[in-house]
Swiss-Prot record:
Pfam families: IMPDH. This is GMP reductase. It comes from Clostridium acetobutylicum (strain ATCC 824 / DSM 792 / JCM 1419 / IAM 19013 / LMG 5710 / NBRC 13948 / NRRL B-527 / VKM B-1787 / 2291 / W). One of its GO terms (molecular function) is GMP reductase activity. One of its GO terms (biological process) is purine nucleotide metabolic process. It is an enzyme of class 1 (oxidoreductase). The gene is guaC.
Amino acid sequence: MESVFDYEDIQLIPAKCIVRSRSECDTSVILGEHSFRLPVVPANMQTIIDENIALFLAQNGYFYIMHRFEPEKRLSFIKNMKSKGLFASISVGVKREEYDFIKQLAQENLSPEYITIDIAHGHSNTVIEMIQHIKKYLPKSFVIAGNVGTPEAVRELEHAGADATKVGIGPGKVCITKIKTGFGTGGWQLAALRWCSKAASKPIIADGGIRTPGDIAKSIRFGATMVMIGSLFAGHEESPGETIEKDGKLYKEYFGSASEFQKGEKRNVEGKKMFVEYKGPLKDTLIEMEQDLQSSISYAGGKSLDAIRTVDYVIVKNSIFNGDRIY
């Protein structure tokens, strides 16, 4: 493959600014039949999203994907969102009971607007079969399939009927797949995104490895329609998970979807737990992300996200921050 790089290795090159104010820049994105205020989605993890956060995001024009780790709540969640006139976006796995759940939704005439097939290694027959099953019983649902890390995987899942693919194998802050297995896109996630997006004919969701707001713009440049983020969305006032105090500072727990803390057992573990500093209200982070992305668009010389997709860039191996950290 071509040159390998990650987020910290890339600097986007500015183009002539055409706006008088960054507030003129539009950060909205279309996914499926809906438009959203930002091309970002909080990771569908237990310490990142719950029913209340999903409701807040949907009511305020943001995309969300509800996690799949409390399957008994999914039916009532879908009904509740639809009763409020909001879109329903859920996750499923590939076990036998998930097939029954999809059939149940069809029988009750409940079609979530978005269904994400959420497993660690998405380039598999089990995912292909689940895509086909959902498309048979819930043909109107927008199916996101993942996670994958190769063009072949993107093509196969699209061919099976996926409406979008999620790219990223273990680059996240609480994912240790690369350490435990030797496989993944950790350390070259941005190059993997570029590689996969060239093969894609449908939207790609970049998942994992986002450490700064600027990484969102870089993901857009290399082919992402939407960017899934875990660590930047962890630790908020509304975030699920335990809050602790240490040395006079507040922290909230954040753990991976394949960690023993989520699984409830120490078996096939590919995730870990950490505590992140308390960040305050979620809405403040969303506003900051929007403002930063508006600035990115202005530097790209346009008024919408499309401007970012065509800017030039340079590869500056591991040196662009020079030790700088904003968090």
